[in-house]
Amino acid sequence: MPKINGNEIRPGNVLEHNGGLWAAVKVDHVKPGKGGAFAQVEMKNLRNGSKLNERFRSADKVERVRLEQKDQQFLYETDGMLVFMDTETYEQIELPADLLGDRRPFLQDGMTIVVEFYESEALNATVPQKVTCKIVETEPVVKGQTAANSFKPAILDNGVKVMVPPFVGQDEMIIVNTETMEYSERA
C-alpha cells in the first residue's frame, strides 16, 4: 500500500490508521502563524461507522488504501440480508441491508450498484446518484401557486418523503438525487 504525506490527504481517500480503515470525510489544511502546517481530518470508520478527528502534520506518513470497486446487481432480500450478483462473474453474495445506510429505500429490483471491497470484505455500497421514483401521495396542483419558489411534501413509492415543486402531481414519475434526497426533475 502506498504511503502519502499528511498534507496529501483528500476527502474520499481511504486510510489505514490505528489498525482500522477510515474514509476521509472532511479535510482542512491549516497553516498557523507559529509552527508547522497540518491537515485536520474528519474520518469515518468503514467497518463500524464511528467518527474520528485527527491531525496530521505535513511530514506524517499514512497508508492510503485502494478499494476494489465491483458492479453488483440486486436480486432479492432475505432475513435482513441483500443478495447481489456480480455482473462479471455471476457469483452471488449476501450483504447486510445496513451497508446502504439511508439510501436503502432507493434500492430497486435489478438495480446495479457499486460495492467497494477491501481484501474480499465489502465495506461500502452506493446506489446510483439519480433514481426514478413514483409519487404516491401529494397535494393536488393549485393554479397560481407557481409565482413563488415554493415546494410541497410528497411521499414516494419507496416511503421516502421529498419536497417537490407545486406543478408535480400524484402518480407522476420523478428523478430523485440519492445523495441529497431531493427532487431533481420529472422523469
UniProtKB/Swiss-Prot annotation:
Gene Ontology terms, MF aspect: translation elongation factor activity
Role summary: Involved in peptide bond synthesis. Stimulates efficient translation and peptide-bond synthesis on native or reconstituted 70S ribosomes in vitro. Probably functions indirectly by altering the affinity of the ribosome for aminoacyl-tRNA, thus increasing their reactivity as acceptors for peptidyl transferase.
Protein name: Elongation factor P
Broad class of the protein's primary localization: cytoplasm
Domain of life: Bacteria
GO cellular component: a single term: cytoplasm
Biological process, per Gene Ontology: peptide biosynthetic process
Family statement: Belongs to the elongation factor P family.
Keyword Coiled coil: no
Subcellular location: Cytoplasm
Gene: efp
Name of a matching Pfam family: EFP
